[in-house]
Amino acid sequence: MNGHDQRMLIRADRVIGRGDASPHMNAVLIKGGLIEDILSEDSVPAHTKIYDFPGHVIAPFFCDYHLHFSSSAGLSTAGIADRLLAHGINKAFEGGDAIGAGLTAKKNLADRLEILSSGFGIYREGGYGKYIGRGVKDIEQAKSEIEALISAGADYVKVVHSGIYDPEDDRITAGGFERRELGEIIAYVRDRGLPVFCHANGTEAVQEAVDLGASAIIHGLQVSEETLSLIADKRVMFIPTLQAFQSLRSRAASDVSLRNLEEAVEGHMAAVGRAHAMGVKVMPGSDAGPPFIPYGSSFCDELWLLMKAGIPFEDVLRNASARAIKRDQQADLLILEGFEIRHVVRRGEFLQ
């Protein structure tokens, strides 16, 4: 739509994002692929090409706080990047697999995406985790795997501290560490300078992870009010992956499974709404990677579900932002109607 060196202004109803933007700002001035200024409607410079989008908002690119680079998705890493960028995602926290594919993707896609990789999760042998990590039988083996992750360039360590939801029996499957083991693992990782993100379902597993120093809880199904209060007090991130749970309905094996899933999702959404009201930082993560959770579109569905759970539109967008909208930074912007992406601006250029 525009020449790269021409000064251009993108104007909408408002600019939503962390950084220099204030509530009365509704336009972003771009030159040479960089944000020159964030403006109000009455302060447009002369000789500027203007693109108007009434009824829309301008937002930063998104960060997906939980996904996997999975071979089962049927896409190359470049294809995954294409899908993510088309949905306005240029930053992602990669949640691990058995072979550490995210570490390779981080290197190969460094010029396109900012990927923070866990490499592979750490899980207790005999419990859930073989598809997303490597099993350990004791603390010493866990420390050895953690050292391997650090050497390979992992940005954080993912610890699997529960199983997954089984809708047929309405229970959380076996998985996780003993409390003492989990405490030692988290302390070891933190001493090495990395955060710990815990896969945890069931309020006891979530509470242990938060008590012992986890930086983030992934999933958190069946979390109690008391544990939500603890999450708020300790300023732990909560990544509820609502869309991932909801997507399981298409795979329900029976009417009983479907009913249990619907009730579980309803309860999880209620917990997310309470978490936000308590001041918990609820972050959007798609859990994309499996074929039934597509890259990009499932993240956008997650945003809608977070708002449906009771988080205001602007708070959802701010939490989803990969970075602030600031002067002199690269002009990566989204033109949104609700959460629907109408245009993507990458390095000051409208993508076709």
Where are these regions (language model features)?
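Divalent metal-coordination and catalytic microenvironments
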Residues: 13, 28, 33, 55, ...
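Active-site core of metal-dependent hydrolases
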Residues: 168-270, 283, 288-290, 308-311, ...
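Anion (oxyanion) recognition and catalysis
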Residues: 85, 109, 190, 232, ...
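Divalent-metal coordination cores built from histidine and acidic residues
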Residues: 78-194, 237-245, 251
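N-terminal metal-binding scaffold of metallo-dependent hydrolase/deaminase domains
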Residues: 1-44, 349-350
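His/Asp/Glu-enriched, well-ordered alpha-helical/loop segment
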Residues: 191, 265-339
